[in-house]
Amino acid sequence: MSSRPGVDQRFLDAYRLRKTDEYSSVFAFRRAFKGRFFIAHYRPNELGTARLGVVIAKKLAKRANVRNLLKRIVREQFRKARPALAHHDLVVRLHVPVKMATRAMINDDVVNLLGRFRE
């Protein structure tokens, strides 16, 4: 995914889910796509842009550095894909342990999940 000229590629606060109610409304909508490691829960929004929340449970990724790495990977792939995504609130949630996964496998899973939300 290359950047397009004139498209803001930053990951601003406006593109993040922050509040518990925002996460709850996405989970309550009960729509999701499942990948190899992650599940992407989604809900359409009227804000004119896609927003992201990331949930990495300690039960599935015991070490903080692994949880932080997974969140960085998801945020980076979202940042790159956001201009082409439909206007949804997304919560990307880890659903299986990633002990034997490579960084490339995780990246591919996130890219494939986000690809389902292209306009």
Curated annotation (Swiss-Prot):
It comes from Aromatoleum aromaticum (strain DSM 19018 / LMG 30748 / EbN1). Belongs to the RnpA family. Its EC number is 3.1.26.5. NCBIfam families: rnpA. The keyword tRNA processing applies. InterPro entries: Ribosomal_Su5_D2-typ_SF, Ribsml_uS5_D2-typ_fold_subgr, RNase_P, RNase_P_CS. One of its GO terms (molecular function) is 3'-tRNA processing endoribonuclease activity. One of its GO terms (biological process) is tRNA 5'-leader removal. Consists of a catalytic RNA component (M1 or rnpB) and a protein subunit. The gene is rnpA. It is an enzyme of class 3 (hydrolase). Keywords: Endonuclease, Hydrolase, Nuclease, RNA-binding, tRNA processing. It catalyses: Endonucleolytic cleavage of RNA, removing 5'-extranucleotides from tRNA precursor. One of its GO terms (cellular component) is ribonuclease P complex. This is Ribonuclease P protein component. RNaseP catalyzes the removal of the 5'-leader sequence from pre-tRNA to produce the mature 5'-terminus. It can also cleave other RNA substrates such as 4.5S RNA. The protein component plays an auxiliary but essential role in vivo by binding to the 5'-leader sequence and broadening the substrate specificity of the ribozyme.
